Amino acid sequence: MLFCCIICSVLRKNSRAHDEIRPVKIIRGWNIYAEGSALIAFGNTRVLCNATFQRGVPPFLRGQRSGWITAEYAMLPRSGTERSDRESVKGKISGRSHEISRLIGRSMRAILDRYALEENTIILDCDVLQADGGTRTAAITGSYIALYDALVWAKNQKILSKHPLTDSVSAVSVGLVGDQIFLDLDYSEDSNAQADINLVFTGSGKLVEIQGTAEKSPFSYGQFEQMMELAKTGCQALKEIQAASLD
């Protein structure tokens, strides 16, 4: 018998229900120079996502007639409650930044027809302007918009014959806080969570990636199933917001 987590009607910060994402706002074309860009807000978390279209591919793909998407993720020095040095000053990219950069790239490639992109590369730069939890999920959700617009640009420039995306993609966090499962954790909730998971879904509901950790105590498989379903619902809501912004 599956363990059933207690879900009550206690409201969270900003009167959110347990299954409610934060207010999401997307501004397309925020950067006038990038082929595609989006400033995305998940509540107080804000991430600028820029997509750069470049001719050519990395050496390992040359001659294969397929394209590539890669990403870089970074946080501005004062994106959090205290200032942190830039990684360029430290002379080393943190393990966290490297991990999230790779996650964003994998998430975008999951919905890409690489052969339709031909031998071209798109670089996604995700810069966290303000962090209040969920920066990686916001970066993935916003990167899809920037990527979409960069590919539209390439098609309009007659560089590509068709749009290479096969689906949409978004991401959301879910966590066990006290006796409740919460969707889209802010920083205060994430800091107090017994367990939290970041999930990436395509618009058609297929799972791209799961990143989960029992931060303070193990959780049951039943709780995991509940968190999965809640995250899928959250990503469907994000899919609708993405579609509205592209309409």
From Swiss-Prot:
Keyword terms, alphabetized: Nucleotidyltransferase, RNA-binding, rRNA processing, Transferase, tRNA processing, tRNA-binding
Pfam family, one: RNase_PH_C
GO molecular function: 3'-5'-RNA exonuclease activity; tRNA binding; tRNA nucleotidyltransferase activity
Binding residues annotated for phosphate, in chain numbering: R96, G134, T135, R136
Protein family membership: Belongs to the RNase PH family.
Entry function: Phosphorolytic 3'-5' exoribonuclease that plays an important role in tRNA 3'-end maturation. Removes nucleotide residues following the 3'-CCA terminus of tRNAs; can also add nucleotides to the ends of RNA molecules by using nucleoside diphosphates as substrates, but this may not be physiologically important. Probably plays a role in initiation of 16S rRNA degradation (leading to ribosome degradation) during starvation.
Name under which the protein is recorded: Ribonuclease PH
Species of provenance: Tropheryma whipplei (strain Twist)
